[in-house]
Amino acid sequence: MGYSLFKVDKSKYNNKKYFGMKKLILLLLFIPLLGFGQDDSSESEVIKEHVVRNEFSIKITDLSNIESRKTESEYSIIVYKNNEVFQNIITPANMSYHPFEERSFGSADINFDGYDDFLFIDYMAMVNYSYIVYLYNPLSEKFEINEDYGSISSPQFDIDYQIIKSFNRGNAAYYESEIYIVLNDKLTRISKTIDNYQSNTYKYIIYDGKKEVHVNEALRRVNLYIGFFKTKKFNIIIDLLDNGKYRYASWSVSRNLRNNPDLILKNGVKQESENEISYKFKKGEFSYTCIFNKLTNNGHLKVFQNQKELLQQKASVFIMPNEVKQYTGNKHKVIISL
């Protein structure tokens, strides 16, 4: 039994005109049905590309009463979302006095999630300084104070590598430097260097994916610690040198990382495919390759003599997030108004 959109009296269609009109009506009814359920690619592309970016304006007013000789600073910090009052930021209680014009109020994507955060100077000495930090929460769309980031000494936020560099100068002969990343939404220190020229002692500490470990201090002069490969026989550290090449340092698992490495290779190169990252090194007729699998987060060590494979071992791997996924930000806009 056929189905019709309309009930039709066939007696009215006994001549060609009616049959012609019938065909025209059916054609007009049928054309829209052809497009029903089909994807209009041009319209879909527009929808996919359309991204709503909120604009936040933060208005800051100094309410400190200098004449009262109070030792605290007091500010009014109002957040406007798309030109409407949205949040009143509360500053820490008993915030030590610091000149308003030297607070360096600003915004930056501190935790590299694509959203700008809000910060200003908390403490400043002759060399070292720290920030009061408010991270943007994309769920509540509010700026929330975070003491972990505020505890970092003299931070520098490096978007290119998605790292936070920290510097602390104790005196003219004592220096500390640290590097932090955001790992599983948690601030994580991945390296620390201590240079004490007065006592002639030096330390180099790295994060191996589970814990911090002390490493031979001669390896501390690097641009960036990249990753740690652990096989059943070897512990391997991959570093990025100042010349843009990679360094391979390897120890037998039975040896302490504070000892000199069994093998150091420089001038390494990085190669990347859709699912893998490889760090390749050569020494004469031997080549060493550390492979990280993006899908499993594990890897392999492969050793070749000329083209012959001598060794292949599975490895647990810690690797810098930026090596796997580069920064993509600019999800909203923050304007500071004083």
Question: Regions from the language model: what does each represent?
Answer:
Residues 37-74, 161-230, 275-278, 283-286, ...:
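Acidic, small-residue rich beta-repeat scaffolds with periodic aromatic anchors
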Residues 47-49, 100-110, 152-165:
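Beta-propeller blade termini
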Residues 74-99, 139-156, 164, 191:
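Blade-edge motifs of beta-propeller repeat domains
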Residues 80-82, 128-145, 179-184:
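Beta-propeller blade repeat segments, especially FG-GAP/WD-type strand-to-loop junctions
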Residues 24-33:
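Sec-dependent N-terminal signal peptides
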Residues 111-122, 164:
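Acidic/hydrophobic-patterned starts of short beta strands in beta-sheet-rich repeat architectures
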Residues 126-132, 174-178, 246-248, 298:
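Structural motif
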Residues 136, 226-282:
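Central antiparallel beta-sheet cores of small beta-barrel/beta-sandwich binding domains
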